[in-house]
Swiss-Prot record:
It comes from Nitrosomonas eutropha (strain DSM 101675 / C91 / Nm57). It catalyses: tRNA(Thr) + L-threonine + ATP = L-threonyl-tRNA(Thr) + AMP + diphosphate + H(+). The lineage of its organism: Bacteria, Pseudomonadati, Pseudomonadota, Betaproteobacteria, Nitrosomonadales. Gene3D superfamilies: 3.10.20.30, 3.30.54.20, Anticodon-binding domain (3.40.50.800), Bira Bifunctional Protein, Domain 2 (3.30.930.10), Threonyl-trna Synthetase, Chain A, domain 2 (3.30.980.10). Signal peptide: none annotated. This is Threonine--tRNA ligase.
Length: 635
């Protein structure tokens, strides 16, 4: 007799062997038709999975997040099946699920073309309509390796050979196509209905540039056509908002081959940077931080002491001078510890909050570089808080308040929070980890925040909190972090004199809000589609004349606005006013002031906002009040 407990607490009792599908059918034929898989005692399994002991079971349908992931995983197999039918000599490698879709990597004698992509998608639709049963079987390892070698699938044979001996080798078959996979998968190919192939890209085998270059086909799959169409519309909008396009259109920055992964900031782009940096300086000062500056090039011996040389060496730029070896800093923390160590510290000095707009360099792979979002030279809004264990809870709580206010001021009102706890390999005692994790969780709970636990995902030196923004298109950007560090202060000799006159090692909190200035500006550009809030816009106002008769008045207005700390320029070109308005509107300037003979006579200004919003005529003083209010409110 087997007892299966359902999520509502109901027990289903069977006196014969059953599968997950049998349980679904016992509940009702409707559920059996829509079920995709099951979660058996917390483990995702196929509908064909036998239930041999008393178990807890959750049936997974396409309404569950896991259901959509299973559909996408099965769609990756559908893609590989179609490629093998159309291009039999192609070799299949891996095909995982990614955010919003999936991909599959292939080795083939020639590059796939857009026409190939269309043919593959059409064949996928045909295979879906065949309603092939998808079956799982566990194979003997050597037999599975031989099977794929006989098919000429040498990559699959390599993967199987690398699977640990204690793991089963499971293969999934649909018709005459068989693939290696842990699963689970949908029961029939017909359950994969809504999908689209998106693009072709290059990818190295096992992600190593020393290996063969493969062809990666990306796709997306959804439960309904409506969801897929909404996703495609979001992609289209994201393409319009691409910060690289807008950066060129708005004359903000450029990048070139002579400095890969490094940014040339133009005056307008640098104006945005300066506004962000000045704002951050103000909020840091108000919250008890002191700003410092540390060297960019440090002797390798310091990186060896900190542990970065051992763990981060391949991403560091190295140089040599006078027989000494140096590294350009990839992060700021060792330098901040040196500032803390300079002089005798007392418990009365703690917490000490050291902040730096630290310029860092990391030797990222050229293929990973992406505009402002992934660069080699970047500036972090970095800070390190040195405190006692008893001060951790209060410091974390204060940081959360600061971070939330900063995000709101920049127009982000929703963020996701994850707490990552102790990994298997770690430093520090269990008691230290218990207290540290409890303090971080308590701070999040004290602020009544929703957060997700990520067991085992913390750094080796301490637990961490990650803050992920959601932008106006619903995309997620991990920016803020707070990491508790047991290791580095001890490794670099940091200490303070405690109240009992003994020397103790401080706790070190690594924290950032924006992450990197470059990436955050890229996110801001895309979030606002280039139409930045007034307080951040490089040009807040442009004053336009209709004819030469108004040139002196335009200059007078421009000077008055500058005196009120408003970023303003004038356009006195001998062009039609409609042309000038259109040109500056495309530059996404928040306000255009149009001046003709009537405005000169009445000593007024006619104001146009974005999206052709006509504010009409008003006094210059009235406009100054309007724009300064918007600047103060950061709208």
């Amino acid at each position: 007799m087997t007892v299966v407990r359902l999520p509502d607490g109901t027990d289903k009792v069977f006196d014969y062997p059953v599968t997950v599908l049998d349980v679904a059918e016992s509940i009702g034929p409707g559920l059996a038709r829509v079920a995709l898989a099951g979660k058996l005692n917390g483990r995702l399994v196929d509908l064909s999975e036998p239930i041999e002991i008393d178990s807890d079971l959750v049936l997974i349908t396409n309404k569950d997040p896991e259901g959509l992931e299973i559909i996408r995983h099965s769609c990756a197999h559908l893609l590989a099946h179609a490629v093998k039918e159309l291009f039999p000599s192609a070799q299949v490698t891996i095909g995982p699920v990614i955010e919003d879709g999936f991909y599959y990597d292939f080795s083939y004698e020639r590059p796939f073309t857009p026409e190939d992509l269309a043919a593959i998608e059409k064949r996928m639709q045909e295979i879906s309509r065949r309603n092939l049963k998808i079956e799982r079987k566990v194979w003997d390892r050597s037999k599975a390796i031989g099977f794929f070698k006989d098919l000429g699938e040498h990559y699959k044979a390599q993967i199987i050979a690398s699977i640990p001996n204690d793991e089963p080798v499971s293969l999934y078959s649909q018709g005459d196509f068989t693939d290696l996979c842990r699963g689970p998968h949908v029961p029939y190919t017909s359950r994969i209905k809504v999908f689209k192939l998106m693009k072709i890209a290059g990818a190295y085998w096992r992600g190593d540039s020393k290996n063969e270059m493969l062809q990666r086909i990306y796709g997306t799959a959804w439960v309904s056509s409506e969801e897929q169409n909404n996703y495609l519309r979001r992609l289209e909008e994201a393409e319009k908002r691409d910060h690289r396009k807008l950066g060129k259109q708005l004359d903000l920055f450029h990048m070139q081959e002579e400095a890969p992964g490094m940014v040339y900031w133009h005056p307008k782009g640098w104006a945005i940077w300066q506004q962000i940096e000045q704002y951050m300086r103000q909020v840091l000062a108000k919250n008890g931080y002191v700003e410092i500056r540390t060297p960019q090039v440090l002797d390798i011996s310091l990186w060896e002491k900190s542990g970065h040389w051992e763990n981060f060496r391949e991403n560091m730029f190295i140089t040599e001078s006078e027989s000494r070896h140096y590294a350009i800093k990839p992060m700021n923390c060792p330098g901040h510890v040196q500032v803390f160590n300079h002089g005798l510290r007392s418990y009365r000095d703690l917490p000490l909050r050291l902040a730096e707009f630290g310029s860092c360099h990391r030797n990222e792979a050229s293929g990973a570089l992406h505009g402002l979002m992934r660069v080699r030279s970047f500036t972090q809004d970095d800070a390190h808080i040195f405190c006692t264990e008893d001060q951790v809870l209060e410091e974390v709580t204060k940081f959360i308040d600061l971070l939330n206010q900063v995000y709101i001021d920049f127009g982000f009102h929703e963020n996701l929070i994850k707490l990552s706890t102790r990994p298997a390999q770690r430093v520090g005692t269990e008691e230290q980890w218990d207290r540290a994790e409890a303090a971080l969780a308590a701070a999040l709970n004290q602020k009544e925040l929703n957060w997700e636990l990520q067991p085992g995902e913390g750094a080796f030196y301490g637990p961490k909190i990650e803050f992920t923004l959601k932008d106006s298109l619903g995309r997620k950007w991990q920016c803020g972090t707070l990491q508790l560090d047991f290791s580095m202060p001890a490794r670099l000799g940091a200490g303070y004199i405690a109240e009992d006159n003994t020397k103790k090692i401080p706790v070190m909190l690594h924290r950032a809000i924006l992450g990197s200035m470059e990436r955050f500006i890229g996110i801001l550009i895309e979030h606002h589609a280039g139409a930045l809030p007034v307080w951040l816009s490089p040009d807040q106002v442009v004053v336009l004349n209709i004819s030469r008769n108004q040139a002196d008045y335009v200059q007078s207005i421009t000077n008055e606005l500058k005196q009120n700390d408003i970023r303003v320029s004038s356009d006195l070109r001998n062009e039609k006013i409609s042309y000038k308005i259109r040109e500056h509107s495309l530059q996404k300037v928040p306000y255009l002031i149009v001046v003709g003979d009537k405005e000169v006579e009445n000593q007024t200004v006619t104001v146009r906002g974005r999206s052709n919003h006509d504010h009409g005529a008003m006094s210059l003083e009235g406009f100054v009040t309007l724009i300064r209010k918007e600047m103060a409110e950061r709208v």
